[in-house]
Amino acid sequence: MSRCCLNLPLRPAFVKQPVWGKSIYGPLRRRFSFSPINVINHSPSETKRRDPVEELRYKPLTPPQDPRKVAPPNSFLKKISLIYQKYISPKQNLYYEATGTARYMYFEAARQATPEKNSLGAFEFWYQKCEIPMTFQSWFQITQLHLWILHTRIRGLPKNEKVAFSQALTTRFFEDMELRIHKDYRINSNRISGMYLKDLFQQQTGAIFGYDQGMLGSDAVLATSVWRNLFVGRPDVDLVILETIVKFIRLNVYRLSCLSTDDFINGKGVHFVPPEESAQTNI
């Protein structure tokens, strides 16, 4: 028997029609007032839906938080900024400071072996009195000796300053050597210039070990290291010249050790006493 024969409505009168539109759970979601089971078990008064505003009115509110415990906006970016200021920024500032001071220190060391106006006395001593040939190898050995004297003071700095200044000074030295190889000797091949730089690096390492051993030992050991590196083991070297160079080394190492850390980092008082003046000074 059909519904029409019984003259029954399609659904009970108290059953609400489905509503399309926005709800508290999201846009355009179909909602029904109740299911067919609710029609059987509940009366129409019980199926009345509560207003969300009424529900919020009776819902207990959380107490306000202490503003001192609430994270500020963009707290992640603020943490990154604090980490940068605490760990990274001081190292970068130290690196820039070391680079600038190392440039001045290297200029003081490199001009001792070049005919500069303010270093003609040292230039004449190394190339005329010592009779060292004016070659790139001789310039490298003389400059390396002055840089080693600077490194003896750099080793006494705090850990971070020691690493920054030592790296900056060595980097400046090898950059200048590479520039001289390309510019003065017209060697444009990176492979050939790299081979020369590797050989010079090995010579530098050996010279540092020799000078360190001589500085901790006697004057005879230091003179032997100077004779082996600067004079390439020549048998006709005057012993008086070796004595003058040993006095020059010890006097300049002593002068730099007397400088305070701040003065040395800022480059104050960083200069070399010429060898001939060192021979007339008693340490």
UniProtKB/Swiss-Prot annotation:
GO terms for cellular component: mitochondrial inner membrane; mitochondrion. Residues 45-58 have a biased composition (Basic and acidic residues). GO terms for biological process: mitochondrial respiratory chain complex III assembly. Residues 43-70 are annotated as: Disordered. Belongs to the CBP3 family. PANTHER family: UBIQUINOL-CYTOCHROME C REDUCTASE COMPLEX ASSEMBLY FACTOR 1 FAMILY MEMBER, UBIQUINOL-CYTOCHROME-C REDUCTASE COMPLEX ASSEMBLY FACTOR 1. This is CBP3-like protein. It comes from Schizosaccharomyces pombe (strain 972 / ATCC 24843) (Fission yeast). The gene is cbp3.
